[in-house]
Amino acid sequence: VTDPRTIPSPNIWHWPEIYEAENLAQDIDGNIPRYLRAAVPWDGRVVVDVGCGTGFHLPDFAADASRVIGVEPHEPLRAAAAMRVAGLDHVEVVAGHAESLPLPDSSVDLVHARTAYFFGVGAGPGITEALRVLAPGGSLVVVDLDVSASPYGDWMRADLPKYNCSAVEAFFEAQGFALTRVDTRWEFSNRRTMREVLGIEFTRSTAARAARSIPGLDFDVRYRVHVRRKPAGIELA
C-alpha cells in the first residue's frame, strides 16, 4: 500500500510504460554512470537507490555492488522494481521514504537519488536521513536536471516560470555538496515515442513546441550531479 503522505510523481505513476521508454532513451552514451563510477565507485559496497521507481537503475548498481537496496514509496512501482531484480539475490526493494529510510545507522556506502525528492529547499530532512544511514566516508549523490541548459531547460522553464536555478544550486552548496555538470544525449527509436515522452514531461503546448524544434530523434540534456561525502573521521573546523 502506498503511504498517503507520499507526493505523487505524475509521469511515472500514471504512465510507467512511457517512462520506461524515457529511461531507455536517456543518456544514451552513458555519461552519467561513467562519471559516477569515477567519482563514487561502488565496487563491493552497499548502495541504496532512493525513489527507485520501477528499479531501472538497480541492475547497473548490482553489477558491481555487494548489496543494493531500492527504496520506493509507491506500491505499484515497488512491485515492478521487485520483478525487475527477481533474479538478483543481492538486490532487494523495500517500502520507504527519503525522510525515513528503513535502514540501520552507518550501514551503507552510497545513497543515490535521481530526479527524486532532492529538488532543493525542503530536502533537508532527506539529507539528514541519508547521512544517518551512510557509513563514515560514504556519499550521498543527487542527480537532477539542469534547468539552466538548453534545450531541455528552456522547455522546463516555460512550464515552471518561478523555478530559480540559482537558488536550488545555492541550497545544495550550503549543504556541503560539490557540483558537477554532466552533458548527455537522449535518443529515441522513433518520433512517436519521443512525442509521448515529451507529452508526460511537459504541458501540451510546450511538448508540441519541443517536438517541432527537434529535427531528428535526439537532443541534448544536461544534468547536475551533487555529491556530499560523510566525513570518515572527526571533521575539524
PLM features per residue range, with description:
Residues 54, 173, 178-237:
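Conserved Class I S-adenosyl-L-methionine
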Residues 48, 53-100:
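Class I SAM-dependent methyltransferase SAM/SAH-binding core
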Residues 109-123:
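A short SAM/SAH-binding and catalytic strip from SAM-dependent methyltransferases
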Residues 99-111:
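A short acidic, Gly/Pro-enriched loop at the edge of an enzyme's catalytic core
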Residues 45, 66, 109:
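Conserved acidic residues
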Residues 1-43, 56-60, 139-170, 201:
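Conserved class I S-adenosyl-L-methionine
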